[in-house]
Amino acid sequence: MASLPCIPSNFKPGSPPRGLPLACKAFGAGASLAAQERWLMPWRDGGLGFSLLLVLAGTRTAEVEGISAAGATSAARRFTAVADAELLLKGPDRPRLCSLPPLPAGISPALISYVAARWIGVDPLVAAVGLTLSPPFPHLRLEVPGMGPAACLSTGEAMGLSRVHALWQRGFCLGRGLRRPLVLAECVPGGTTTAQAVLTGLGLQVADLISGSARQAPMILKQELVDRGLSKAALGFNPPPQRVIAALGDPFQPVAVGLLLGAREAGQPVMLGGGSQMVAVLALALAAMEPSHRQDMVDGIVLGTTSWLAEEAKRSDGRPGALECLIDCVGEFFGVRLLGLATGLRFNNSQHRALQDYELGYVKEGVGAGALALLAQLQGASCEQLLEACDQAMNQLLGTSYS
């Protein structure tokens, strides 16, 4: 993978306090203090650096009316990934070729990712696969042009098996070539539904554990699509993970699974930035491994997410929320202990309604926002500093004209 040069940041080398930063939370069966400390060690030193890869991908599942809030209409969602990536790369104060699609509420999580990436001093690398629109900025192309998005998962034939295999191998080669830790981020409208589909295809019962970009996830609609896809795919018992992806998945998944397996073979730790889509990737990787090797692999992996997603559907009596239940469900299914970490960033005191909407359950996560905010905290940023920077970025965004 290409080396990622640093850009100017507010990070000052030093020795951050041990343990998680203020307001950050660990969750999952692997959330022991010893496991947290072991995992955090390679990420605390800002001088070591890490690779940040954002994968953009497309699926026709996103065009189903009501399935996603990553764009107010199905037409708008075709361009969400490219617009989000351009915001991450260029920032809110420079003209961009792709306007952010209108959302029912909130603002793109790419704004949070941009702020955190600037603080850390990391320059993202963007990869694209299966998009309707080719990104108008330098990016890593993972397959020949013209392949297009995956078909809707309800067809039971989302992609050809040969395409899945090729993307898996492409990701594996990239991961195996890593020489430093990897933060993997994604932007895949409709991706929480394909995540639910592949997890179900692997044999897990997760229908009530999958979130999404909408304030109220369309659980009935999601399950209807999954049921139709499973019926047509006829996967049977214990299907191979590549077959599951081909039937029900999206192009991001085979790339990400390959990357994960390759990175761990190279001995590099990986932070999966997101929620259920990253949990699905981890489950697919575990399904491809011998049981005796699974815990060794996940010992170097953590899920990094936002507080809004980590606390979603958390019971008033303190019982775990949906995401924690999901990673524990996957961990129990494959006999491993998984660790999740959530940033402490909140927007209750933001100056902007679009950011305050996150506190109401809109958007929640995406483009690696939670993982990058967490890493910014690990390298010295306070929640107040990140909030102020996000407010400033919103001010810039509202004053930006588009070319």
UniProtKB/Swiss-Prot annotation:
Pfam families: DBI_PRT (PF02277). One of its GO terms (molecular function) is nicotinate-nucleotide-dimethylbenzimidazole phosphoribosyltransferase activity. It comes from the Bacteria. InterPro entries: Nict_dMeBzImd_PRibTrfase, Nict_dMeBzImd_PRibTrfase_arc, Nict_dMeBzImd_PRibTrfase_sf. Belongs to the UPF0284 family. This is UPF0284 protein PMT_1350. It comes from Prochlorococcus marinus (strain MIT 9313).
